Amino acid sequence: APPIQRGHWGYDFALQLVRASVTRFHRIQGVDGFENITDPKTPTIVVANHQNGLMDPLVLVSLVNNSQVHWLTRADIFYKKLTRTILFSFNQMPIYRQRDRLSDARERNAKIFEICAERLRIGARMGLFPEGNHRAMKSLRPLRRGVSDMVNASLKLDPSMRQLQILPVGIDYEEMPSFRR
């Protein structure tokens, strides 16, 4: 199980680069609902549509100022040791998909959801893209069951987690392939 990193200098440095890059290359307009972002100690699952691969979590991370989001990330990129070390240091965890064709994918995910539940219990923010993949589409694709599995694991771990919040986020790019100059 990946340990929780608190105040990791690499994350703080990368976050500053991400914020500078996102605001440099993308014009963010129409951000509504920030008043609904809860106290950083309230366990929260950030759930967003997934249009643009790596850019989606970077945009979200650059906007959430007061706490780190622990992302569920497709498992196949954790196979290389250096990449895995970096991802774990940024509090990312692998999520196994059906297309990974692992016979024990459900068991592995059950363990990951237990870790997510423990992190939520201590006030972390978890993030995932329930569509399970990304495409440049202007519509929501069918959702996978990850959010419900995470909520169930959390309530099973600690029934008092009724204050668990799900924060829905909609991302819509006007011009995905182009960058602002």
Q: Which positions does each model-derived feature cover?
A:
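Short, contiguous pre-domain boundary segments
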Residues: 1-3
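Soluble catalytic domains of membrane acyltransferases
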Residues: 6-181
